[in-house]
Structure formats: structure tokens, C-alpha cells
């Protein structure tokens, strides 16, 4: 059976369930496992992957082999690769330089992104992508870094006045 939109279990619980065999398959961003495996957060860092072609090449590159080995050591089999360009949706002006983040509350998407936003003077909030819309709508966050798919799927354009798009 297929359970869409975290209806079987919460997003952040899926990695542990995959490891334990309680969940058979998940279309799961590797950065969601970054709390346990910090090395996986490299996939969400800005300017590390600059094109879809480069992202796909990681599968057979040394970095891809290492990521696959790390996941397999945790009991998770990586079946396919997908890289998505992303950006920052904001309720106010676009965030294009570090000073633009100062004083804002931002969903960074990974520990490392949170560290960068905090260094720029922002407060951060940790949540899966499917919680961004309501958090922006209620004012719990001012902006969110996320994938292009999430920007579109969760209709963040309805709440955003600014968008900072990444390359790719």
C-alpha cells in the first residue's frame, strides 16, 4: 500500500523505521537523516551541487559511493538518486545576502544550513517540508529553505513575497 504525505508516519520517523524494517520504502530526502548521519547534509548545502547533471553523477562518484556505504551500514538501501534545485521562500523581501536573514526566523532544512542562518543573525526552526506552509501562514517562520519540488508542491508562492532561487 502507498501512504502519501506522511499519512503512515511522521516524516522524521521514517529513517528510523527504514532502519528497523518497519517501513519498506520511502521517497525520502537524505538530509532528513542528517541528524543521525551529518555527512548526508552535504546534499543540501548551497553551491555544492550546481546542476541536475552534477547531482546525478554523484551516484557513481566517490562521494556517492561513500554516502551509499554509510546508509547501508545503517541498514538502509539507497535505490535511486535524485537531486533537486531549491531556494528560499520568504514572506518578505528575498534573502540574497547574509544581512537579509538578520532578525528573521528561518527553516534551514539541515543542521549546517541552520548554522549558516544563525551566523547571519537569524533564528532557526526545524521542521519537515510539509509543515512549512502552515508555519509561514501563521507567522511562526518568516522564510524557509527547501527544494524546488517542495516550493511547488506545498504552494509556497501563495504566501511568499520573495524567492531566492538556487542554480540548477
Spans of model-derived segments:
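N-terminal secretory/targeting leader peptides
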Residues: 1-54, 62-168
